Design a protein with these regions (language model features):
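Portal/gating segments that form or line small-molecule/metal binding sites
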Residues: 2-122
């Protein structure tokens, strides 16, 4: 979904068995090197610049729960003060003031709540 003022980017990952995490909850297979084919690299500065460009994150409840486990393990909250919308019908604990929960139509969420407020929605 795109408007002249905002863009929604969907980023999904899954292993061949259809799950992101291992049975023990680890997602270490997602960790990759910062160098790629043809000698291209990602510098820490490039990554930081990219992450600062994201105005709002939208995630499912399982991804959110994984992020909370990282916090509990001492890794910190990966999203800083950037607003996070968690798609869920369950009662979950908010990790930060910037976290809100949503259960409803995604088109309504994007068009009525996110696009008026944010330009780069992930």
């Amino acid at each position: 979904m795109t408007t002249p003022d905002s863009r929604v980017t969907i980023h999904m990952a899954a292993s061949l068995d259809g799950f992101i995490a291992r049975k023990d909850g680890r997602v270490d297979w997602l960790e990759t090197a910062d160098s790629f084919a043809d000698g291209k690299t990602l510098t820490p500065e490039a990554i930081a610049t990219f992450l600062r460009s994201i105005d709002c994150y939208v995630m499912g409840s399982r991804t959110y729960e994984t992020a909370l486990r990282f916090v509990d393990q001492g890794h910190g909250w990966a999203y800083g003060d950037t607003p996070v919308v968690v798609l869920t019908s369950r009662q979950l604990r908010p990790a930060r003031d910037a976290v809100e929960f949503y259960a409803g139509d995604l088109v309504t969420l994007v068009r009525e709540r996110l696009q008026p407020r944010f330009r780069n929605i992930w």
